[in-house]
């Protein structure tokens, strides 16, 4: 007679960590029978499921000014709080391109209440961290601090975006800092290639311009340009105050009303419209045979954040995956493209990407190759794309679904990435999508869905290409374009 036994040893401290239902836990024995320990028993697997999904609630409140306050209280002793603003380089024109990024640099250079030194000392004495970044569609200012210092952190953030002095001396000093930053960016070939990719994919549109702006703009941006950008775009309906960690939503709401109130008034008239950005299949080539490796990105037009096909394209992106020589492996790699790349020694590394904006996006792959293998690597990539459109299998899609869910959950580790997730989703969807809903949408993707959606956006579509380095062997654009479909007899 087969016997199954399960032994569970828990310290008293471990028992206390079992949420508050510590008297009941279900375990499966080796023979499949249910084993219980504790005084109370879980009566059904449904009860267990309810416990697993018992994640902190994301609470959202909209103030009269349009400012949205969103938070998740996880009971930690630290927190992250920040302002997510629907304003980035996409809202600029050719003359003021670079203003949003310039403002990010000026944020910590002093306000009407605090000098730059006072601001730095106050943050350091709190043991906090203050940071900011600019993207093509968003500008973000955030602070990481102890939960008890949440009121001071919110007050500092409010002071920064409402009362920055924008002194002429600081502006002149920051020009040099940004120009040096531009030089550093130009040494990062991946960033260079992606800027070129946007420039060719979105020609003569706002998304085609860089975030830092051209050198001539950085040298000429004035205080008036900065003030005009703030008064035009830093308005209540386009700002989210997000927080995560040990935060009380009611306290955060009171702080928002006190420090922002009616100061972030709504727009006079309509909110500035987002300029449309048309995708153009095209290429940029910067040949330099002195460089040791070729850097190449190829992409097709994808969809915006809220489009129904976004999830499916994310799964397809995970299917292609990424690979680096340091990974090792071989034919046992889960990604088919990684198997072919490793077996044929076709490149040093590759990574797939799915970059989404409000109404458009780029879905593609970035690779680093030897000059002699550029053509072969690109051919294998396009062949794998065609396979996604025609013959991807259910087992591959199941693996990609699980990997995507795992990666998304692993990213939500700590108050800062959770706060980032809240702020970004509030701007993109005007709500935070619950994890169970997101998992259900991912699980709904199957091989047939992948084939349909990839055929819609990849098959026989004109790609955008950006290539830098020794790219003599790179096929011409007509040949690359013809490989975006399979011709059958």
Swiss-Prot record:
Task: Name the reported effect of residue 422 to T.
Answer: In MMDS6; small decrease in protein level; impaired frataxin/FXN processing, leading to the accumulation of an intermediate form, called iFXN
Q: Which PROSITE patterns match?
A: INSULINASE
Q: Which reaction does it catalyse?
A: Release of N-terminal transit peptides from precursor proteins imported into the mitochondrion, typically with Arg in position P2
Q: Which GO terms describe its cellular component?
A: mitochondrial matrix; mitochondrial processing peptidase complex; mitochondrion
Q: Which domain of life is it from?
A: Eukaryota
Q: List the catalytic residues.
A: 104 (proton acceptor)
GO function terms (MF aspect): metal ion binding; metalloendopeptidase activity
Q: Name one GO biological process term.
A: protein processing involved in protein targeting to mitochondrion
Principal place of residence:
mitochondrion
Q: Does the keyword Transferase apply?
A: no
Co-factor remark: Binds 1 zinc ion per subunit.
Transit peptide span, please give it: 1-43
Name the site position(s) for Required for the specific determination of the substrate cleavage site: 191, 195
Residues at which Zn(2+) binds: 101, 105, 181
**Keywords from the named record:** Disease variant, Hydrolase, Metal-binding, Metalloprotease, Mitochondrion, Neurodegeneration, Protease, Transit peptide, Zinc
Regulation of catalytic or functional activity: Binding to PMPCA is required for catalytic activity.
Disease per record is: Multiple mitochondrial dysfunctions syndrome 6: An autosomal recessive, neurodegenerative disorder characterized by basal ganglia lesions, cerebellar atrophy, and neurologic regression in the first year of life. Common features include truncal hypotonia, lack of independent ambulation, poor speech, intellectual disability, and motor abnormalities, such as ataxia, dystonia, and spasticity.
Q: What is this protein called?
A: Mitochondrial-processing peptidase subunit beta
